């Protein structure tokens, strides 16, 4: 039977939820997540680093952490924003109304969100757009399905973010370059 639910939270920020026309509020996301868990489902919530762009990164990180803390899902999965051709956010980016963050700015947003997380589940970076570079040249985070156990491994994740911020930004994947090439 069905025992796991994957939910595209995207953000816990009500302003951004309106901008992207998600059709739900942060309170409704919290309510739905709690109901799914109370019904016995394993819950994976997906959030999108940089969905607020440079303009709203802080409120995006803070409010997403707030919502995730309230829900306390089994899994939190990072899916960094990559604007796709044919979408409104891509057109906003192309027209200069939305500004994609640099790799280090995305790590700063991730750092703030992780610092604010008080959950007892797992935080996962199991998608190729989380492929920031570590100092050894490999990926910064391990990208397996199980991720990092919180709160036990929270300090390790923050250490890895610090490491990523010390790596020259040109060594990280820059979403702007991928969008410009139209490779996604």
Regions found by a protein language model. Give the residues of each.
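Auxiliary Fe-S-binding modules of radical SAM enzymes
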Residues: 69-184
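Conserved non-cysteine loop/helix-boundary elements of the Radical SAM core domain that shape
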Residues: 1-41, 49-71, 92-104
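A cross-domain feature marking catalytic cores of carbohydrate-active enzymes
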Residues: 7-11, 45-49, 78-80, 125-127
């Amino acid at each position: 039977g069905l025992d796991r639910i994957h939910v595209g939270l995207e953000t816990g920020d009500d302003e951004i939820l309106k901008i992207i026309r998600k059709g739900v509020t942060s309170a409704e996301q919290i309510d739905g997540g709690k109901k799914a868990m109370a019904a016995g489902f394993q819950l994976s919530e997906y959030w999108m680093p940089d969905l607020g762009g440079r303009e709203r990164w802080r409120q995006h990180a803070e409010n997403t952490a707030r919502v995730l803390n309230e829900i306390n899902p089994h899994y939190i999965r990072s899916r960094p924003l990559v604007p796709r051709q044919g979408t409104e956010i891509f057109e906003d980016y192309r027209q200069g109304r939305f500004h994609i963050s640099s790799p280090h700015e995305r790590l700063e947003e991730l750092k703030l969100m992780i610092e604010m997380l008080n959950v007892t589940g797992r935080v996962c970076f199991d998608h190729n757009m989380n492929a920031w570079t570590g100092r050894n040249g490999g990926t910064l985070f391990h990208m397996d399905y199980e991720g990092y156990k919180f709160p036990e491994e929270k300090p390790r994740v923050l250490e890895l973010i610090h490491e990523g911020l010390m790596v020259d930004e040109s060594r990280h994947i820059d979403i702007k370059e991928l969008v410009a090439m139209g490779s996604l």
